[in-house]
Amino acid sequence: EKDWRDQPIAVEAKGLTITYPGHLMQPDFKAVDGIDFTIHRSEVLGLVGESGSGKSTTGRAIAGLQKVSGGSLNVLGIEMNGVKERDFKPKRADIGFVFQDPGSSFNPLMTIAENVAEPLIVHKKFSSVSDARKYVGDLLEMVQLPRAYMNRFPHELSGGQRQRASLARALALKPSLLIADEPTSALDVSVQAKVLELFKKLQAEIGFACLFITHDLAVVDMLAD
C-alpha cells in the first residue's frame, strides 16, 4: 500500500486567515486566524473543533466557496488568496463536497438518480442519458444502495441512505479531493458507524485526499491519518 507521505501535496495552508466583514457598528469577525496545515493526496486530515471555530469556513475556502482574507491557501496547485473564478473553475470538478445534512443539498423534486447525476450533467460527462443512468447505478452500488433506489425521491430514503447517496454524488466526478463537513453528525450512532466504514473503504480504494470536519474525536480516531 502506498504511503500518503510520499504523495504530492493536494492542499497547503500557511497563515490562512478568513475574516467576515462586520456590519453597521460590528467589528470584523476573524473566523479563521492564521492556521497552517497540509493534506497530501490519499491522506485524510481530521479537522476537529467546537462549533463556531471556523472548521466549516476552512472547508468552504478549500472548495472555493469562501474568500481567503490573508495568508496562503494552495488547492490542487491554485493559490486561493485572490483567485479569479475563471482560473479556479477547471478545478471545481476535482473537488467533492459532502454536507452535514444531505436533505438540504438534494433537490426534493428530483429522483435520487437525477440528484446524483447533477454534477455529471453540469460538467457534461455523458452524451447519452442511458450511459449516465448506468453510471449512476454503479455509483449507488458502490455506496451499497440498491440500483432500484435510483427512482426514489430523497424523502423516501432514511438519513443514512441519503448520506450514502450524497457520498455517491460527491464521488461522481472521481475527485482527487473530498471535503466532508460533519457528514455523519445528523445520523444515529449505529447508522453513523456504517457510513464511516463505507467512507473508509471507498477512501482506501479510490485514494482521494480528504479534509474530514467533525466535532467528534472518536470519528477522527477511526478515519484520520
Residues of each region from the PLM?
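Conserved ABC ATPase signature
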Residues: 153-157, 161
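Conserved ABC transporter NBD signature motif
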Residues: 71-79, 91
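Conserved ABC ATPase "signature" region
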Residues: 130-148
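Hydrophobic anchor residue at the start of the ABC signature
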Residues: 116, 167, 195
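The feature captures the beta-strand-to-loop junction immediately N-terminal to the Walker
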Residues: 48-49
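A short, proline-enriched helix->beta-strand linker immediately N-terminal to the Walker B motif
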Residues: 172-176
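Helix-to-loop junction immediately C-terminal to a conserved catalytic motif
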Residues: 63
